[in-house]
Swiss-Prot record:
Descriptive protein name: 4-hydroxy-3-methylbut-2-en-1-yl diphosphate synthase (flavodoxin)
Entry's family note: Belongs to the IspG family.
Keywords: 4Fe-4S, Iron, Iron-sulfur, Isoprene biosynthesis, Metal-binding, Oxidoreductase
Lineage of source species: Bacteria, Pseudomonadati, Pseudomonadota, Gammaproteobacteria, Enterobacterales
Annotated InterPro entries: Dihydropteroate_synth-like_sf, IspG_bac, IspG_bac-typ, NO2/SO3_Rdtase_4Fe4S_sf
Enzyme type, top EC level: oxidoreductase
Pathway assignment: Isoprenoid biosynthesis; isopentenyl diphosphate biosynthesis via DXP pathway; isopentenyl diphosphate from 1-deoxy-D-xylulose 5-phosphate: step 5/6
Gene name tied to this protein: ispG
Role description: Converts 2C-methyl-D-erythritol 2,4-cyclodiphosphate (ME-2,4cPP) into 1-hydroxy-2-methyl-2-(E)-butenyl 4-diphosphate.
Enzyme nomenclature, EC number: 1.17.7.3
Known cofactor(s): [4Fe-4S] cluster
Amino acid sequence: MNNVTNIVRRKSTRIYIGNVPIGDGAPIAVQSMVNTRTTDILETVTQINALKKAGVDIVRISIPTMDAAEAFKIIKQQVINTPLVADIHFDYRIALKVAEYGADCLRINPGNIGNNKRIRSVVHCAQDKNISIRIGVNSGSLERDLQKKYDGNPTENVLLESAMRHVDILDKLNFHQFKVSVKSSDVLITIQAYRALASKIDQPLHIGLTEAGALRNGTVKSAMAVGFLLNEGIGDTIRISLATDPIEEVKVAFDILRALRIRAHGINFIACPGCARQEFNVINVVNALEEKVSDITTPMDVSIIGCVVNGPGEALKSTIGVAGARNKSGIYEDGIRQKKRCDNISIIEELERRIRAKSKLLDPNNHNITPTTYNK
């Protein structure tokens, strides 16, 4: 694979969420959100650690009550080296409390956080604690006056007006450590809203399609919206919102970044769908291998082709590849065909062995490593 992207990133200011740089050319950060009850500290910490193992850069936690804020205090003490974004709605006092407890970023929703006085209180607190803010506009919870103005139709214009209203507030307060999102559940509205916002401000943008749906449908819609924006150079952090295990959100996010050659993380599988020419069951091999090496974060290309039509050509471009042949298939490593062929019944085991050996060689300390970038 050509590991250099031609995408020109939109210029933006630099902020930090914990120790993670955002914007101004920093690697695009992957964010997810726990779906546990925050007051269940053990379950929440367990899920955060699982997300971290999957490669997540930033984790968001919903803080709906003061009890949740108190739980957040303990969670923050137990989570090491993973920045936590506190998701705040309705009660601005919760934002003040979690900022005191070490939140790395405050997500506020302009549609329900309250009047300007309350927003100023949150901003002053963030300034005192030197933490960032995300202005998180969402099509499902816009301000009442904007809903009335636009007859309840959450178009890109409504999202943009809501965002700019609060950008102006933060600017007037001389607060610049913030990023902005304008999410809709509609792919085209999301794209149009972010395009418009990107042309008006230079703050980092957090991109995503809100409430995208279940795994398959949500992945397709998110890939369309997020991939389209990334290809235009728009986006500094991403979150794929799926109604499934949040680990899948992280996987899909990295799949999108890898497909656009923006950020390499884990294995890029190249595999044929299988046909009458296949000499081994490609589908079974791919599915089994993908599961077995899901813990590998070292970037590499692995091609699994069931016959000699395209197999050798793909293998020559891959880190590790197999080209199907009768009884024994050809194995390639770094574009070189290996002298010893592999029994077709042992392909899964042989490829896993080679992948793990290559991962250890390329990155001896491969244990939830910080993902690399293609264009770093």
